[in-house]
Amino acid sequence: MTFEQLIPLIIMAFALGMDAFSVSLGMGMMALKIRQILYIGVTIGIFHIIMPFIGMVLGRFLSEQYGDIAHFAGAILLIGLGFYIVYSSILENEETRTAPIGISLFVFAFGVSIDSFSVGLSLGIYGAQTIITILLFGFVSMLLAWIGLLIGRHAKGMLGTYGEIVGGIILVGFGLYLLFPI
C-alpha cells in the first residue's frame, strides 16, 4: 500500500472515529473509573474492526440497500442510550446506577460503529488493504473514544450532578443529528 492510498483511509478512520469521540464525551460524564474508560475504548475499537470487516465481506453490492438502514439504526440506538442515561440519572441514586458494562456497553459500541459497517460495504474486499483498513479504523476509534471519555470525565467534575444529564442529552442530540442532518 502506498502513502497516497493510506491517506484516504486515515481520513476515513478519523471521520468514523469522530462518532465515537462525540458520543464518548457524553458517556464520559458518567462516574467512570480509568479502568472502565480503557475497557470502553478497547470495546469501541474492536467494534470498529468487526463492523467494517463484516461490511467488506458482504461487499459493495449491498451498500445501497443497507446504508440508510445502518445509519438510521445507529441514530436510534444513540437516542435510546441517551434517554436511558438521562432517565437513570434522574430516577436512580448514585449507588444503583449501572456502569456502561455488559450489554449496555455493547449497545453503545455497536451504535457508534454501525456507520463503519456502511463504509466497509462501500470499500469491498481488497486483500491486504482489508486488514490495514480495519485495524486503522479500530485503532483511531479507540483512541478518539478514550479522548472523548477523558474530556467528558473532566467536564463532569465541573458540572457536578448535572453532568450525567448533559451527557445523555449530548447522546440524544447526536442521534437526532444523525437522523435529521442540518
Curated annotation (Swiss-Prot):
Q: Which HAMAP family match?
A: MntP_pump
Molecular function in Gene Ontology: manganese ion transmembrane transporter activity
Q: Where are the transmembrane segments?
A: 6-26, 37-57, 71-91, 101-121, 131-151, 162-182
Cellular component aspect of the GO annotation: plasma membrane
| Keywords per UniProt | Cell membrane, Ion transport, Manganese, Membrane, Transmembrane, Transmembrane helix, Transport
Q: What is this protein called?
A: Putative manganese efflux pump MntP
Name the job this protein performs: Probably functions as a manganese efflux pump.
Spell out the InterPro entries in the cross-references: Mntp/YtaF (IPR003810), Put_MntP (IPR022929)
Subcellular location, record wording: Cell membrane
Q: Which family does it belong to?
A: Belongs to the MntP (TC 9.B.29) family.
Topology in membrane: Multi-pass membrane protein
Native species: Bacillus anthracis
Phylogenetic placement of the source organism: Bacteria, Bacillati, Bacillota, Bacilli, Bacillales
